[in-house]
Amino acid sequence: MIQVEHLTVRYGDKVALDDVSVSIPRSGVTALVGPSGCGKTTLLRVLGGLMQPQQGNISGLHPAETAFLFQENRLLPWRTVLQHLTDVAPRHPAMAPRHWLSLVELEGEEESYPAALSGGMARRLALGRCLALEREVLLLDEPFTGVDPQRAQRILQRLKDLGKPVILVAHEPHLAQSCDRVVELK
């Protein structure tokens, strides 16, 4: 179980998270939902060790076991789709990248560069790159932005099938409802 206890994060005078406590199972897909500015991304960043809270603590999760998908795709324009995955695949560089391409439905785009991809395709490539890290816990910030709803549902099901804990920020109600649990931030 991942325990978040009395977490408070401020950006100057603005309070992003105020005394937030939540338990998140280390299995299945958990969606973080709520209005813009309620702290979903901030909570994800704290869980991933990318920022420190002013108060509170987290137990049951170490940043080294997480893979983080940022809201921005952060793709390298000079690397092909396949190279983006082979750069990070730790175990089976010849096999694993194609597996992740298949999971995010980018087969046939191996030699394409990011500039040739649609927004949804670039988002799926960023997700594939995150998956290729083969970390224990996936922290995904709006993983389906620009991805059509049917494809997003298929990929979400594949994420569930991985059997890893996934914590994602979801703005799409139908995707949040398809997750194993929903945590609402206000």
Feature map (PLM): residue ranges:
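Conserved ABC ATPase signature
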Residues: 113-121
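Hydrophobic anchor residue at the start of the ABC signature
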Residues: 127
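Conserved ABC ATPase "signature" region
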Residues: 94-109
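Q-loop/switch helix immediately C-terminal to the Walker
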Residues: 79-91
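Catalytic Walker B motif of ABC-type/P-loop ATPase nucleotide-binding domains
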Residues: 138-142
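Helix-to-loop junction immediately C-terminal to a conserved catalytic motif
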Residues: 48
